[in-house]
Every structure is written in C-alpha cells, then in structure tokens.
Amino acid sequence: MSNPVKGRHQARKRAVDLLFEAEARDLSPLEIIEVRSALAKSKLDVAPLHPYTVVVAQGVSEHTARIDELIISHLQGWKLDRLPAVDRAILRVSIWELLYADDVPEPVAVDEAVELAKELSTDDSPGFVNGLLGKVMLVTPQIRAAAQAVQQAVRMAAGTSEDHVPQREPAAGQLGQDDSNGGQVAAVCR
C-alpha cells in the first residue's frame, strides 16, 4: 500500500521540477505537461505524471501573475528574477496551495515548501522560504474573503440568491488526498 503523504510530497517535488523546467526552457507549464503526457503514452518505460502534479502545475500556470505579485510584495531587498529559479518554483507551488488547494492545510503547504527547499536548493533557502510564506499566510484569509465577495457579487448580479459561496470542486487528484487529517477534505473555504 502506498503512502499518500509521500505520494503528495513526490507530486509537489515533480511540480517544482516541471515549473523549473518550463522556466528554463521558456515554455509554459502546460506545454511541459502536454509533452510529458504524450511521452508517457508513447513509451512504456515513462511513467505518467501524478494527477496532483498536473493539478498544481495547471493551477500555478493559471494564477502565476497573482502568485508572483504576492511573492514580490513580500520580498525585502530582493527582486523576483534574482531569486534562485528553484526557490521561485517552490514558492509558486506553496502559494498556489495556500490560496487554491482546499484540501491542504496551510501549515502543511509551508512545511512541504521548506522540505523541498532543503532537498533542492541552497542552505539559506529553507529559512527564506519559511519566512516569506509566513508573511503570505498572514494575508491569505483576506485574499480568500475578497475572492468570495467577488464571487457572491457576480452571482447576485446574475440573479442567484444564494447566501453562501460554494467551495470550488476539487480538481482531479485532489479529493481524498489530504496530507494531515486521514484523507478527509478540509472544509475551509478558499
């Protein structure tokens, strides 16, 4: 039986690799996913991407501008393009999880990012990643609340009279794969 926590960790690591590769090759993450998927279909010895890797890479690709804006707003004495490329990829994955992954508790997203920084980057990176993500975590509730308000306003303008904002549907590979609460999906609106 496979360990879902280790599976998610490896999927995150592969998402970081994929984002790093996309940036290095000046391609979009979606193009890399497409190439990897085609390769896995055509060659028996090439494993397909983990579904969570695809979900994360697609999510980061869709929200890169907002994610990078958050990173930039919390950098002190640094510019985004001066960060090590692997640190940018790690931060993008983690911030995507903080903002958009309903089934990943915030402390898990940060801890995973720090672990990836220990595995993949410089000696200074884990502390840097932890510090920056700690600052981002302070504003994520406001960001999620603002997103909910916008969604509710759109619904009201469309004539829907619901009093609550439904959670977004978990993307493929997300449902039931929580890292910390026995596989149950967190009931936090994000």
UniProtKB/Swiss-Prot annotation:
Belongs to the NusB family. GO terms for biological process: DNA-templated transcription termination; transcription antitermination. It comes from Mycobacterium leprae (strain TN). GO terms for cellular component: cytosol. SUPFAM superfamilies: NusB-like (SSF48013). This is Transcription antitermination protein NusB. GO terms for molecular function: RNA binding. The keyword RNA-binding applies. Pfam families: NusB (PF01029). Residues 158-190 are annotated as: Disordered. Disulfide bonds: none annotated. Keywords: RNA-binding, Transcription, Transcription antitermination, Transcription regulation. Involved in transcription antitermination. Required for transcription of ribosomal RNA (rRNA) genes. Binds specifically to the boxA antiterminator sequence of the ribosomal RNA (rrn) operons.
